[in-house]
UniProtKB/Swiss-Prot annotation:
Protein name, entry field: Ubiquitin-like protein ATG12
Disruption of the gene: reported phenotype: Does not significantly decrease the growth rate under nutrient-rich conditions. Causes only mild infection in point-inoculated spikelets of flowering wheat heads and impairs the spreading to nearby spikelets. Reduces strongly the production of deoxynivalenol (DON), an important virulence determinant.
GO molecular function, one term: Atg8-family ligase activity
Keywords, in A-Z order: Autophagy, Isopeptide bond, Membrane, Protein transport, Transport, Ubl conjugation pathway
Topology in membrane: Peripheral membrane protein
Gene that this polypeptide is encoded by: ATG12
Organism field: Gibberella zeae (strain ATCC MYA-4620 / CBS 123657 / FGSC 9075 / NRRL 31084 / PH-1)
Chain positions covered by the region annotation Disordered: 1-40
Entry-linked Gene3D superfamilies: Phosphatidylinositol 3-kinase Catalytic Subunit, Chain A, domain 1
Amino acid sequence: MSETPKDQGPSSPSPSPSPSAASPMPLADNEVAGSGASSPNLPLTMSASVVLADLPRDATAALEAAGSFKTDKIVVRFKPVGSAPLLAQDVCKISATRRFEEVVRYLRKKLRCKETDSVFLYVNSAFAPSLDEVVGNLHQCFKNSHGQLVVAYSLTPAFG
């Protein structure tokens, strides 16, 4: 029995990987979906297949991971702006699934604000998020290099 070296492969002049039977063949730009072989995967045009190469093909798989956060608790660091009083403890932890209104409520309680007093909160000293924004989403998008969500607060409007 003669053995061929493992690095030479088949005797064809240009070895190229053969397409897998499990991976769908993208459609050409002028082809219509559903006109070819029946495949359980969604057919894509050639231009779309390049863009969507790394995205999940099944929407349910994407939706399963969409609502989850990497950490259960988010570290929020409060920074006073202008004449706002300093907090004795400027760091707190809040559940990632809570809404930003909980952060506002916590800060108002710590500052001992009256019902009529205004408090303005800004993420990264840049924008005021909506009260129904999820804290975990803000953390994923705007955390600092220490993994903290920095919230600046003021008793008068600032940054805008």
